[in-house]
């Protein structure tokens, strides 16, 4: 069912003098005094309004515009007034920010300072390690080397000059004063490492039990069989997007082809794009499908606050949302199969406590390069093990932000979408869990999407995914402690969901392998056990790869890359925990617009040629068609002419030099496994620091 008009329909104004031409009305929604939202329902009136605007620009309404009435031109002026008001409001907000320094601005400056502080720490550590290596090389050259210094300390008669005496004093100092703090910190990290490994092992055992007993959510009977009398509920489908011209067409197309009665679902295209040319392309795509009978509306916010959460919150405030029972959310690069709603909606039947049905992600570009292969390992474990086990045994997991269906009542009772963090999906999931709503995960329902193909895009995505949870933990902790849920659920939320899997994992990974291990090379009295460096990490990596057995040849690159990413994750965790500026950053992940199958692109091209142009020629002005074609040509030619360049990441490069320096020092102590681990890990940091993994940025 299309939404009822909340503005004023103007299709009848354009029908006069047009031979009775019919069209779907346009709704210009003025939902706030600053005219912050525009909603277009249907192709005809929007195209006519744009045609009138073009005609005015070309001579005050000569030619076709002579027959238009004053009322028609009034509507054009109203649209222009709306745009002017939006731009004026944006200008006023920008001017206000110039004279008023907000807490977010102060936090952003503090966050940048913290980033420089971490880089300075790594540089200082590197300088000290190079100095220590020079000292050890000089001692080795002079024959002062000791493979195990604690076994023998030279007597006074054995000391050869002041340099040898200084070296012996340095050995005594590090054995008496430096060794103990390093050993204490290493034992603490080893303890955290063992706890996290046990958690990973328990999750894998739970997944094995699910597979063995064939446990999964099931639908009673076949509700869609002929004569079953199934009453299709009203479903709202939301597609939030922002400047994603590479993927908008295929995501809208997939949503419009969902197998559900057309009068029973509505698609909202929530466009937060700042590029007007992209807005025009998305409007044309919406118009194409609307003309084919799909209930689809286009919404654009002039004042884009709150990122994705603000976009979804604005869409849920529409009056017609009260007519819908469920809402399905798909990000701009997701392509649901036509039977998605038939596989998810029936699970709500007879289960009033069920608030969320989450589907699994499947990736169209998982074999594109080494970076996408390594991401696929991580995400396969996340869905196959973490999400599935938590869904079966706890009825709770973190909402993945897309490819899920919410009961609208659950959203409303949990406070709706909040703009306080950049992980609005996890935020609403935690609040719904505290209100007693249950979740289920469907491992056999997969939705196609894309993985970031460049390290820059992946790095920014991981920063948001690891800073947001820590920021959310600060905000949710009082609510968790006072919530009316069982104590074991509170313990699971605090100890496992937040602390162990979001805080401890990046902390010990960075501290143990990037700080303590290099330190022990220059302070050999504090030695890390071999099983911590080699055996247990390899076993844990093997468990991670089990859900994607085809990735087994990449077990060693996966282990090294995860340790490399610990720098980004640790930095993000600190920024979120201490509410620094970078925890508020939201950068849309770069997409490439890859299709799932070869015939998908053929079908899209056929639809564009056979449906878009002929129908748009009837509904859109000639000038707009020319503009659309020019945008299409620029979109196709841009990737060909763009030059790709490598970006240098200073933190990763500095850590690479640090680890390679420590590897050189380990040779003097004849520590074979330590040497090889530090060597390969240092090379891994070097590859990442030089942006040699994944696709280079444009």
UniProtKB/Swiss-Prot annotation:
Its main location: Golgi. GO terms for cellular component: Golgi apparatus; Golgi membrane. It is an enzyme of class 2 (transferase). Substrate binds at residues 331, 333. Keywords: Cell wall biogenesis/degradation, Glycosyltransferase, Golgi apparatus, Membrane, Transferase, Transmembrane, Transmembrane helix. The chain crosses the membrane at residues 124-144, 190-210, 503-523, 528-548, 653-668, 673-693. It is found in: Golgi apparatus membrane. It comes from the Eukaryota. GO terms for biological process: cell wall organization. It is a multi-pass membrane protein. The active site is at 272, 425. GO terms for molecular function: glycosyltransferase activity. Its EC number is 2.4.1.-. Belongs to the glycosyltransferase 2 family. Plant cellulose synthase-like C subfamily. Probable beta-1,4-glucan synthase rather involved in the synthesis of the xyloglucan backbone than cellulose. Seems to work simultaneously with xyloglucan 6-xylosyltransferase. Xyloglucan is a noncellulosic polysaccharides of plant cell wall and consists of a glucan backbone substituted by xylose, galactose and fucose. This is Probable xyloglucan glycosyltransferase 2. The lineage of its organism: Eukaryota, Viridiplantae, Streptophyta, Embryophyta, Tracheophyta.
């Amino acid at each position: 069912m299309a939404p009822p008009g909340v503005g004023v329909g103007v299709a009848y104004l354009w029908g006069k003098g047009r031979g009775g031409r019919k069209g779907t009305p346009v709704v210009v929604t003025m939902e706030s005094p600053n005219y912050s939202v525009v909603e277009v329902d249907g192709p005809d009136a929007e195209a006519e309004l744009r045609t009138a605007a073009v005609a005015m620009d070309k001579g005050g309404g000569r030619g076709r515009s002579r027959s238009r009435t004053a009322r028609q031109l009034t509507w054009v002026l109203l649209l222009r007034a709306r745009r002017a008001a939006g731009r004026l409001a944006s200008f006023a907000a920008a001017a206000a920010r110039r004279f008023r320094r907000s807490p977010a601005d102060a936090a952003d400056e503090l966050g940048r300072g913290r980033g420089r502080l971490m880089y300075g720490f790594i540089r200082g550590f590197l300088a000290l390690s190079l100095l220590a290596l020079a000292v050890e090389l000089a001692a080795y050259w002079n024959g002062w080397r000791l493979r195990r210094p604690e076994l023998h300390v030279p007597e006074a008669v054995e000391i050869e000059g002041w340099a040898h005496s200084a070296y012996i004093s340095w050995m005594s100092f590090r054995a008496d004063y430096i060794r103990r703090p390093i050993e204490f910190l290493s034992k603490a990290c080893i303890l955290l490492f063992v706890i996290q490994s046990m958690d990973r092992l328990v999750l894998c055992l739970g997944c094995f039990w699910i597979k063995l007993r064939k446990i999964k959510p099931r639908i009673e009977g076949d509700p869609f069989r002929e004569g079953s009398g199934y009453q299709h509920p009203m479903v709202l489908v939301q597609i939030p997007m922002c400047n994603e011209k590479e993927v908008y067409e295929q995501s809208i197309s997939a949503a419009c082809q969902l197998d559900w009665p057309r009068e029973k679902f509505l698609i909202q295209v929530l466009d937060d794009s700042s590029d007007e040319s992209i807005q025009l392309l998305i409007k044309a795509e919406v118009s194409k499908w609307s003309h084919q009978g799909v209930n689809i509306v286009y919404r654009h916010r002039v004042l884009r606050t709150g990122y994705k959460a603000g976009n979804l919150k604005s869409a849920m405030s529409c009056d017609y949302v009260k007519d819908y029972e469920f809402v399905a959310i798909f990000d701009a690069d997701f392509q649901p199969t036509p039977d998605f709603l038939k596989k998810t909606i029936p699970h709500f039947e007879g289960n009033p406590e069920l608030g969320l049905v989450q589907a699994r992600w499947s990736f169209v570009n998982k074999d594109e390069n080494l970076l996408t292969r390594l991401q696929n390992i991580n995400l396969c474990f996340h869905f196959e093990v973490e999400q599935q086990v938590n869904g079966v045994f706890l009825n709770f997991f973190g909402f993945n932000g897309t490819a899920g269906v919410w009961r609208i009542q659950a959203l409303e009772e949990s406070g709706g979408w909040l703009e306080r963090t950049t992980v609005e999906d996890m935020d609403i999931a935690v609040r719904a869990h505290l209100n007693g709503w249950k979740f289920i995960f469907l491992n056999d329902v997969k939705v196609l999407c894309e993985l970031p193909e460049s390290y820059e895009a992946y790095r920014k995505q991981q920063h948001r995914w690891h800073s947001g949870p820590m920021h959310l933990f600060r905000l949710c902790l009082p609510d968790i402690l006072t919530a009316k849920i069982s104590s074991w659920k509170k313990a699971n939320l605090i100890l496992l969901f937040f602390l162990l899997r979001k805080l401890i994992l990046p902390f010990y990974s960075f501290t143990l392998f990037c700080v303590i291990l290099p330190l022990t090379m220059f302070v050999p009295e504090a030695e890390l056990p071999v099983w911590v460096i080699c055996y247990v990490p390899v076993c844990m990596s093997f468990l991670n790869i089990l859900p994607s057995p085809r990735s087994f040849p990449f077990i060693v690159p996966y282990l090294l890359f995860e340790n490399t990413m610990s720098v980004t994750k640790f930095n993000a965790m600190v920024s979120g925990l201490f509410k620094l500026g970078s925890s508020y950053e939201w950068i849309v992940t770069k997409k490439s617009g890859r299709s799932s199958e070869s015939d998908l692109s053929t079908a899209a091209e056929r639809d564009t040629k056979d449906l878009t142009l002929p129908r748009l020629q009837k509904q859109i002005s000639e000038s707009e068609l020319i503009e659309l074609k020019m945008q299409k040509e620029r979109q196709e030619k841009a990737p060909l002419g763009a030059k790709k360049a490598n970006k240098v990441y200073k933190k990763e490069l500095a850590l690479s030099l640090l680890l390679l320096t420590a590897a050189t020092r380990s040779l003097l102590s004849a520590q074979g496994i330590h040497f090889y681990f530090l060597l390969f890990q240092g090379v891994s940091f070097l590859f990442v620091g030089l942006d040699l993994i994944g696709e280079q940025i444009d």
